[in-house]
Amino acid sequence: TSSIFGMVAVPGQSAYHATKFAVRGFTESLALEMADTNPNLQIHCVHPGHIGTNIAGTARMDDRVAKKVIEDGKKSIFTWKPPTSLEEMGHEFKQGGMHPSKAAKIILSGVKKNKRRIFIGLDARLLDLSQRLFPKHYHKTWILFVPFLLLFRDKKPLRSLD
């Protein structure tokens, strides 16, 4: 699994982006290398957008970094209410994302359709599109659609996976 942050980058996440871009490059290269070896072999790279998990709440960081993360969160366009603590940031992140059961359904659908890249969530698809249309200035376009994504995010679990 890569991330939408294997397609686009934001300040302050260089190490994270490096790993996610690496996963994307490795997966795409592997898919090309293996293309003629076995017609039944499928290779996919999953690029989730904002999925409601504990990733932000369980992240460990130095106190100085944590303070900067909270300060940066106050300027973020990805949240309605700026966090006052790491715990609050983790809670808001989990509550604000797509339910993991819906993400799983999208992944399975992408695998069934043999998609090489599987984008999870409208946010992931729009961030990817903004990068393709505006390669040097994509981050400046996010303010146009992120508020709508926050309003219409699908946070409900699938009934069969509750």
Question: What do the predicted segments below correspond to?
Answer:
Residues 150-162:
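Terminal low-complexity segments of carbohydrate-biosynthetic enzymes
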Residues 8-15:
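Active-site loop immediately N-terminal to the catalytic Tyr-X3-Lys motif
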Residues 19:
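Active-site helix of classical SDR
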Residues 36-122:
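SDR active-site lid
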Residues 22, 26-34, 46:
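Hydrophobic alpha-helix immediately C-terminal to the catalytic Tyr-X-X-X-Lys motif of short-chain
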Residues 8, 29-41:
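Active-site-adjacent segment of SDR/Rossmann-fold oxidoreductases
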Residues 115-151:
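A transmembrane-helix-recognition feature enriched in membrane-embedded lipid enzymes
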Residues 3:
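Residue(s) in the substrate-gating loop at a strand-loop-helix junction
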